[in-house]
Structures are given as C-alpha cells and as structure tokens.
Amino acid sequence: MKKCYPTLLATTVWAALYGQYAHADLAAQCMLGIPVYDQPIINGDLNQLPINILADDSRADYPRSAKFIGNVNIKQGNKTLTADQVQLDQTEDKVPLRTVTATGNVHYDDPLIILKGPRAWSNLNNKDTDMYQSDYQMVGRQGRGTADKMKLRGENRYAILDNGTFTSCLPGNDSWSVVGSEVILDREEEVAEIWNARFRVANVPIFYSPYLQLPIGNKRRSGFLIPNASYSKNDGFEFLLPYYWNIAPNYDATITPHYISKRGLKLDNEFRYLTKAGTGTLALDWLNNDEQYVKDKKTNTRTARESDNRWLFYWRHSGVMDRVWRFNIDYTKVSDPEYFSDFSSQYGSTTDGYATQKFSLGYAQQNWNATLSTKQFQIFSKDTSRKAYRAEPQLDLNYYKNDLGPFDLKVYGQAAKFTSVGKNNPEATRWHLEPSINLPLSNGWASMNNEVKLMATHYQQDIPKATENAEYKESVNRVLPQFKSEAKMVFERSTYLNNNYTQTLEPQVQYLYVPYKDQDNINNFDSSLLQTDYNGLFRDRFYGGLDRISSANQVTTGLTTRIYDESLVERFNLSLGQIYYFERPRTGKETIINSKDSTGMMTWAGDTYWKINDSWGLKGGMQYDTRLGNVTMGNAVLEYRRDEDRLVQLNYRFVDRDYIQATAKSAPAFQQGISQVGLVASWPLSERWGLVGAYYYDTKEQQPASQLVGLQYNTCCWAINVGYERKIVGWKDNNSEYDNKWSFNFELRGLSNNHSLGSRKMLQSGIMPYQRAF
C-alpha cells in the first residue's frame, strides 16, 4: 500500500520528483542551469579509497600538520574538494584526531550535492563537516539554497542548516523559497524538518509555521497537500486544504476542510487500509447545517427533510483470505437525493440515479463456488412508487465439471429475497436452477460449441392489494429449455499493401432457441434490456437478471476482420453482424420493441476501430433494429493525440427515442432521445502556456449540455491554472438549470521530470470527462 502526496509549500515540489511524464521542451530548459555529475561512479567503501592531493605549494610538520597552498584539489572516490588553502592537523593523542580546514573559494561536490563557501572544516575521523556562509545546489535535479552554516553529520546522513533556505527555482530566480532558523535534512528517512519556517514569494514572507516537516523522497509523509480554490454561482467561493496523515505503513488518511461560502464548512475524510483481510477505503463527508439547503427547501427546490445536515458515507473493500474466502463491500449512502447534485464527489454522480449498497461473502474451491450477498439501492428519484428492489439476501452457487468425456457440465443456482424500495409494490422470494451441458470442439483455426440448458424458476410473490396488475400470481413456476450452437473460424494472411502486416478474417455463426413462456404473471424485480452491440448479438439473453427470459428462434451471423502490424499491434478492426428472427422474441405483452408479429425481423450491429497512425485514431459503433425501423444507438470518436498535452477529439453519441421509451421508462430526462456532439481539445500555446476546452451540444434540445475551458501557465518551479465550467445541474419547468463555476489552482513545482502542463487533469475535472479513443 503506497500513497505519496505533494504537501503544501515546498512539499508540493518535493513529491513531484516522482512524476512519470514530462513536457520535453520545458524540461530541457529547466535542466540547463542544473549541474550534472558526469564522472564514472565509484562504488564500494569510499572512505577506504586513497586520497589524491594537488596544490601549487605544500608544507609539512610531520606528523602534526600539513599545509597545501594555491589551487588545492583533493579527491577521494566520488568526492572532490577545492580551495585556495587547505591545512591538515593531527593530534598526538593515543587515538589521533585528524581535521582539515579549507579557506578561500571552498568548493565541494559529490554525485548528490555541490557546496560553496569561504571556509570549511571537517573531522576526518567521523566525517563531520562544517561549511560557513555556504551555497548548495542539488546535482541532477532542481533544488538549491543557502545557509549561514551547513553541518554534515552521521556519515553524511544528516545535513543541518543554520538559517537555511530552499527553493526549486533555477539560479537567478527566487519566485518562492522556504526559510528556517534550523533545517535538518535526513537522507535515510527522506525527510526535512524546518523550525520557524517562513514561506516567501518574491522574497516577501506570506506564511509562517513554527515547525514544518517535508518529504524529500518517495517515503510517505504527513503534511498539507495542494490547496484548491474555486467560485460558482450556486456555491459561491470554495477553498479546500487537504491534510495527509501517514498513520502507519498500512494505514493512511486524508482530512480536507472544505469551505463553501454559501453553505458552510464541510469536512471530507478518507481513510485507506491494507490488512490480512484485504484492502479498502472508508470515506465520510459532513456538512453541518447547510445554509443554502435551508433556503432551497423553503423554495421547494430541494426535498423537505427535518435535518439540514448533509453527509456521505462510502466503504469499498476487497479481500481474499486463505485463498478460498472472498469479501467485497461496495456501499454508498448520502443524506438526501440531491447530495450529488449539490456536491462534486469521486464516490458517485447524480447521473447514476442511485447509490449502490452491496455486501458479499464468497467461498471458492476447484470445481465450485458460492456467494452470499445483499444488494440495496438508494434511489435519488422523488417518486416513492418507483419500482426498485433490494436483494436481501441473495445466494449464488456455481458448479463446474469439465472433461466428462467430450462434455463440460455447469450448474448455476440462485435463491433471492426481493423487497421494494418504493411503496405498494410486489415483493418475492425467487429460486432458480440452471444446469447446462456443453460439447466444445476446436482445432487451430476453428471452434464449435453446442449447449443444452434448462432454466427452472419458482416465485413466491407477495402482492399488495393496491397493485394495479391483476395478472400477478402469488406462486409461479417457469421452466424453459434452451439450445445454442455456435461456431467460429479464424483465417489469416499477409496484407496486399504491406507484407509485414497480417489480416485476419473471423466469421461467426450462432443458432439460439428458447420456447415462449408468458411471464406477465411475474413482476419484474431485476431484469433490464441489455445493449445490443456487436458482441451483444451473440448473447443468449435479451435481458439481464432472471425475471424476463425472452423466447428466441434466431440465427446470428457476424464477420470480423483485423489488421496487425509487424509488432502484432492491432491497427484496424471491423465487425458487422445481424440477428435474423424466425419468430419474434417476446416475454408476454407486446411492447414497442417487439410489436411486429412477423418473421424476418433483423437487428444489425457494427463496431470499428482504426489506429491510423501513432497520433490518429477512430472508433465507432452502430445498432439498427428493423422492429423499430430506426438506428437505435450509435457513437463515433475521432481523435488526434500527439502527446499528453496535445490532443483534439470529436465525438458523437445517439440513442433513439423509441428505444429509450421501450427500455428505460424510468429515465424521464432522456425520453426524447439522446443526440450529443462533443469537441474536446488540449494544446500548448507555448512552452509555458496551455489551453484546454470541452464543448458538448445536445442537438435534440438544441442547447449546450456542458462547456469547459481552462488556461494554465507553467514554469520550472511553479504553475497556475484558471478554469471555467458551465453545466446543467437540474431541470425546472422543463427548462435546464445551469451552474457557472470558476476554479483557481496554484502549484509549486521543480524537483522532478514532470513539467507537463497538466492538461489531462483539467479535462478529467468536467462533468463529461475526457476518455481516450486509443
């Protein structure tokens, strides 16, 4: 478990040592003034190596002293000392004390640091060294400063600075620095302790702390993280100051005071742990007496609640014990349905429509496994009659037995108890058993699988008197057989245009048969229509869950072609497939999606991906359903990306209105369909200036859905960015409600190879975050 944070002030720069990406031009510019140790590194016990001394003149009073005068150069291993004059003294004690005093233009360097000063003293017995009125410069990385006196102790483990300073800015640039009456650098523990610390900008003190501990390496250290400030119409001024607490090697926490001028002080807390039982994250956010929420309730724009406190609790855990036990928790609960509308959070989004609360305990052996779970949902909809169900509990069993002669056996079983989130909805206990036998056949270029399955389900339903559907029955048995046969072949050849490229041709065919069974007497507890992309054409189910098992008498055919380069990197693929229905699939009453009572209906789906070169990429997909007579869904992305800071992406997504009304009636905001075009761009204006932007337009509503623009200025030792975002946060009287938000960030930089403009981070902050196309 490892988490390294940049801390406030100098810490924001120290941790940047370990960034992975660099803006090449600025990185090269920042390294121009940095010394590099270009001599061969000598390993071993350096103190046992011989000492070589060169000087214009020398005098000796053996064995008590020796003096070297003029252009003195002393070298031992990787260490070099030069000065105008050097004197070596040795006492005549039983254990002689040997010291060296250097004066005049003293210069010391090794692979880690360079020291300069008018005078230096060193104890050759224990290697203690003092440098007076010294300047120091780190080697191979940014970092320099001064000290009235610099002391090296503990075989150079400790560097103690009296009235010391530190900055990551290049020589001649003092944009910022940290000053302390005493600074102790511990190279082994990788930490710097500063007493009476003053943070200065352009030599003007702006922050004081009696004690400050800063990381100077990759070890985790407690401290303040980079602050964040923003302003929005709905929330006013916001300021976040995170504090990272390194509790133990396997525990840490982040505590973030979050001031919101229109709401109050919110505390965001995250705790991470790693134990024998697994790894996990706990989060608790709390805002006492939300002032804006009180006002919103008075205007009926927020749900009426007795409490005005806003909070979030989150727990995610994943663990394995003794190689057979598995523990998983995914639990999110908020104070009210509008929480994610009012607060941005990494733990959920208002577009999800609900918060998941799931606990599961699993046990696995070689041929079987079992999982006991509970699943609940906190629904954000204000409709209390909405049909959403909890599974409390649910038991899933799987048994596998391969190589039964030529056959493979699988048995799946489930028992679940469903309770309703809303009022006056049916509830049930469901038992399901699903044995299947497979006959797989394959060789080097083809495969075939034949499967016979039996799906037996029993329902014991509790039906309230207020239920509108009179067809529901308390006890229902449903038994359905299924037969599926699928075959696939793979052919390959060298391409005509380039013999180093390989093209594959992959035809695929599947026949699926499930007889019809009227299921209108069963309430729908957990089934929803699955998306039919190309891979979805070859599923054996139209619905997820078990409450709706559609009839099927259909043949699915598909063809995929791929092109690989000489390094076996996939450069292009195209898949096109269709389902031909001999009988219309149905589960009971007709709906828009299966309203036509005729054979010959088809569903088409295609996906493509084209990596044109290392900078250009294209991908997309489309589904067409003859039952609706329309394109049901489509998406396309064209992207140019030269590096992390230079990219332009054009994207489009479409979902047909009839398809949504047939499959997602509980999403009123999208009942008119989805048709959105987006443009995302990031580009450096110069080595130091960068611009990012994102614009999404809803062609159905004929209005912008989201807009984002950000400007960043980056130097070798600090960076600043300003962002503006306009997004839809709700609906009122069928009109969109927008929020305008300004954000401001200041970051110290310098001791790293990371001179990136941070464009990716800015694009990820939007309500529709950037996603790579390739």
Curated annotation (Swiss-Prot):
For this UniProt entry, what's an example GO CC term?
A: cell outer membrane
Q: Does the keyword tRNA-binding apply?
A: no
Mind listing the UniProt keywords for this protein, alphabetically?
Answer: Cell outer membrane, Membrane, Signal
> Which Pfam families is this protein grouped with?
LptD, LptD_N
Signal peptide as annotated in the record: 1-24
Its GO biological process annotations read: Gram-negative-bacterium-type cell outer membrane assembly; lipopolysaccharide transport
The domain of life for this entry's organism is Bacteria
Q: Where does this one sit in the cell?
A: Cell outer membrane
Its function, per the record, reads: Together with LptE, is involved in the assembly of lipopolysaccharide (LPS) at the surface of the outer membrane.
Q: Which family does it belong to?
A: Belongs to the LptD family.
Q: How does it assemble?
A: Component of the lipopolysaccharide transport and assembly complex. Interacts with LptE and LptA.
The name under which this protein is listed is LPS-assembly protein LptD
| Species name | Photorhabdus laumondii subsp. laumondii (strain DSM 15139 / CIP 105565 / TT01)
Gene behind this chain? lptD
